[in-house]
């Protein structure tokens, strides 16, 4: 029974193929891109009519095989390998009746197909663990769709479920295009997929498979996902595929030297999705691909090398393809060109002995498909023996041998002696110039929006507003330019071609200037420590001599006739300089008293000062901000034998002066001047006067947008030890400490200056403090 059912289903595939067109064209290209949820899209391109494929899935090994009836393969590379967790390799093969694509997977998978224009999109994702249901029940439960219905609906999706395990033994014994038993469902309808499933299908397939949304619905999910993918095609071109779900507009594309910058306006990229791909090893014009966030926009930067040209396509909303091709040889260029040439024509072999040059040109025209027109001046014979040489290189060799050159217009190539072509070019240019000199003059007003009209005076090299003449290369000898500063308008009078050049120039230059927010942080930290130890002591007394009384001692004035009074004055006076805690001892003795005082001090200080000036300015425009004091100083001037006194104001400010310069690759070069001045007290002789403590920085540095750079710093450390003592007495061990004063001081100061520039968006950003 199962064998009969297998034959019936195989017959249905044959019937389906019979209803399709006898010749459906060739497969010309295969591209792979990524979707969220670990999905892949394989895009198969055709040169003619599209055929919806039939196929089957195996789990061991994990493969998806798709057959395209009455289809050939027209690709230089028929085996494509990928370093991907799901898809590892795509192999293409053909026989007389069909073409087959085999998708080798790293793990079991499932797929859906969809026809879009001249392409078939194959959506691949991982299969659930419970998908491997028995093959026989799946065959019985799957109703076969009529062949006519399949052929008449090329734009519908077809779903293929898991068939019998395709063992390696069966694979080796089977012919290259032997069909396996598959379960074919009805044409795919996302709205009716669950309702149309039978009870047996629900038992064989898990609930997850029924609830799975098709790839198209997943692509339209509201969650914004952005991803990039890179690959190389058969033309040595680098292909970058950008998937930006949720972005419905068109990207802004600009070219700056060796960079292609693609900007998605108002499409925010999460920080975790920023990435950079180094693809230089692929040997394409693309060297590096960077996806990053720029304010509220997403920016794709393609770094290139060599000569290239860009082709961009939009496959669907949110999906963009950028193809960077090596630039082909320009056949229209004439004259001497020492640059290395690249030849891409079909290889041919020629072996002639003493043959007319015209005959050789005729053969090359047939081989290349070009229409070659030779001048009457082209004549002579030559011997030529070439094997497996591109036809365009053979043509170049013939022209070099006979001093010939060519000019191409469409599919027609004119070949003549080089001098003859140069004379024609010169005559043509002279005729165009004569026509321009005799043409009518027109007047056009250009009111500038963002630039100052005076800036165009220097661009056009106009000394005054009504200057005429041909000193400027943009203006013809009969033209003139007037400038109206009141209305910011340029009035151009010249031929139509010159006015059109002015229009293009103004469109390129009259654009809003980028703005930069520059933020500086000045951090000043100080750490101080000091310790002092001092001593002072003295003695006083009174002694009676006969009938007289004489006073003696340290600390009182000696005299005669004094009373029995006691007093004390320190004669060893070595205290600490600062006010501090002290211990004083007085000891009375029979004839006087001793006084001893010990003083000690220790201090620890830590300070931190933060200054944060910031300023907003346009690109290449200087900005300045200051905050502080103006301190008056008295200045005495002496002249002609007399003197005069004046009062001058000196600034003590915290200031930031900066001029930013944005480079084409988004870096910022800044010329920075930072001042941090403050009033201070300075010693001048025996006086203390007012002075200004200054800290200045002048530098030029480059930093990336949003990056922070330390542009300067100063570190100071002062260490001091002082010792004051009484000679000789201070040197006595132990007791000598009573005749000493010690001091220790350590001060550390550090100044660091940070600077952070940020390029503001065109709409402007609010300042945040």
From Swiss-Prot:
Where are the stretches annotated Disordered?
A: 135-156, 197-228
Q: How does it assemble?
A: Homododecamer. Tetramer of trimer.
Amino acid composition bias (Low complexity), ranges on this chain: 135-154, 197-225
Cellular component GO terms, alphabetical: cell outer membrane
Name the residues that span the membrane: none
Family the entry assigns: Belongs to the bacterial secretin family. PilQ subfamily.
NCBIfam families assigned: IV_pilus_PilQ (TIGR02515)
This protein's encoding gene: pilQ
- The identity of this protein, by name, is Type IV pilus biogenesis and competence protein PilQ
Another remark in the UniProt entry says: Present in outer membrane vesicle formulations which are used as vaccines in human.
Task: Tell me the Gene Ontology biological-process terms attached to this UniProt entry.
Answer: establishment of competence for transformation; protein secretion
A Pfam match is: Secretin_N
Entry's InterPro entries? AMIN_dom, GspD/PilQ, NolW-like, NolW-like_sf, Pilus_4_PilQ, Secretin/TonB_short_N, T2SS/T3SS_dom, T2SS_GspD_CS
């Amino acid at each position: 029974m199962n064998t009969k059912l297998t034959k019936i289903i195989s017959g249905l595939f044959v019937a389906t193929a019979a209803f399709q067109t006898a010749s459906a064209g060739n497969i010309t290209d295969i591209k792979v891109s990524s979707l969220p949820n670990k999905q892949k899209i394989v895009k198969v391109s055709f040169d003619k009519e599209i055929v919806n494929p039939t196929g089957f899935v195996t789990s061991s090994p994990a493969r998806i095989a798709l057959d395209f009836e009455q289809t050939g393969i027209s690709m230089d590379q028929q085996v494509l390998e990928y370093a991907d967790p799901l898809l590892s390799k795509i192999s293409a093969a053909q026989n007389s009746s069909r073409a087959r694509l085999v998708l080798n997977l790293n793990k079991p998978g499932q797929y859906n197909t969809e026809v879009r224009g001249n392409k078939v999109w194959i959506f691949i994702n991982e299969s659930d663990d419970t998908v491997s249901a028995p093959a026989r029940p799946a065959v019985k439960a799957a109703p076969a769709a009529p062949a006519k219905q399949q052929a008449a609906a090329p734009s519908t999706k077809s779903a293929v479920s898991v068939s019998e395990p395709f063992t390696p033994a069966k694979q080796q014994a089977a012919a290259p295009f032997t069909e396996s038993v598959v379960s074919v469902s009805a044409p795919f309808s996302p709205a009716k997929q669950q309702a149309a499933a039978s009870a047996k299908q629900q038992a064989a397939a898990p609930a997850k498979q029924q609830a799975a949304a098709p790839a198209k619905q997943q692509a339209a999910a509201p969650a914004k996902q952005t991803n990039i993918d890179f690959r190389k095609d058969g033309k040595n071109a680098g292909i970058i595929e950008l998937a930006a779900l949720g972005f419905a507009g068109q990207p802004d594309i600009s070219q700056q030297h060796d960079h292609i910058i693609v900007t998605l306006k108002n499409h925010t990229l999460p920080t975790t999705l920023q990435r950079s791909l180094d693809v230089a090893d692929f040997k394409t014009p693309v060297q590096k691909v960077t996806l990053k966030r720029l304010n509220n926009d997403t920016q794709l930067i393609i770094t290139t090398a060599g000569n290239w040209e860009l082709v961009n396509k939009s496959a669907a909303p949110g999906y963009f393809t950028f193809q960077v091709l090596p630039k082909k040889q320009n056949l229209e260029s004439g004259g001497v060109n020492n640059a290395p040439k690249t030849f891409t024509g079909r290889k041919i072999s020629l072996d002639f002995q003493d043959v007319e040059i015209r005959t050789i040109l005729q053969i090359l025209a047939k081989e290349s498909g070009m229409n070659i027109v030779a001048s009457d001046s082209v004549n002579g014979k030559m011997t030529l023996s070439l094997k497996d040489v591109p036809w365009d290189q053979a043509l170049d060799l013939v022209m070099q041998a006979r001093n010939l050159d060519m000019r191409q217009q469409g599919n027609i190539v004119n070949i003549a002696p080089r001098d003859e072509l140069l004379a024609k070019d010169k005559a043509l240019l002279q005729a165009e110039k004569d026509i321009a000199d005799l043409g009518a003059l027109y007047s056009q007003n250009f009111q500038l929006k963002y630039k100052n009209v005076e800036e165009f005076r220097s661009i056009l090299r106009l000394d005054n507003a009504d200057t005429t003449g041909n000193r400027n290369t943009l203006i013809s000898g009969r033209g003139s330019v007037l400038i109206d500063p009141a209305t910011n308008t340029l009035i151009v009078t010249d031929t139509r071609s010159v006015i059109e050049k002015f229009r293009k120039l103004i469109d390129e230059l009259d654009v809003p200037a980028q703005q930069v927010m520059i933020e500086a942080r000045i951090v000043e930290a100080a750490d101080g420590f000091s310790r002092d130890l001092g001593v002072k002591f003295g003695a006083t007394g009174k002694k009676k001599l006969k009938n007289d009384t004489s006073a003696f001692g340290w600390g009182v004035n000696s005299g005669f006739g004094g009373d029995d009074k006691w007093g004390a004055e320190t004669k060893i006076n070595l205290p600490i300089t600062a006010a501090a805690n002290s211990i004083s001892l007085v000891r009375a003795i029979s004839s006087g008293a001793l006084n001893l005082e010990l003083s000690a001090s220790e201090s620890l200080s830590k300070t931190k000062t933060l200054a944060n000036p910031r300023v907003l300015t346009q690109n290449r425009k200087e900005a300045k901000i200051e905050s502080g004091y103006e301190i008056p100083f008295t200045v005495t001037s002496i002249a002609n034998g007399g003197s005069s006194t004046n009062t001058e104001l000196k600034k003590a400010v915290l200031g930031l002066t900066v001029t930013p310069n944005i480079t084409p690759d988004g870096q910022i070069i800044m010329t920075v001047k930072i001042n941090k001045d403050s009033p201070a007290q300075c010693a001048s002789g025996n006086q203390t006067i007012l002075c200004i403590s200054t800290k200045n920085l002048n530098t030029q540095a480059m930093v990336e947008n949003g990056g922070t750079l330390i542009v300067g710093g100063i570190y100071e450390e002062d260490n001091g030890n002082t010792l004051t003592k009484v000679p000789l007495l201070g040197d006595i061990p132990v007791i000598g400490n009573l005749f000493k004063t010690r001091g220790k001081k350590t001060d550390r100061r550090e100044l660091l200056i940070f600077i952070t520039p940020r390029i503001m968006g065109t709409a402007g950003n609010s300042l945040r403090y």
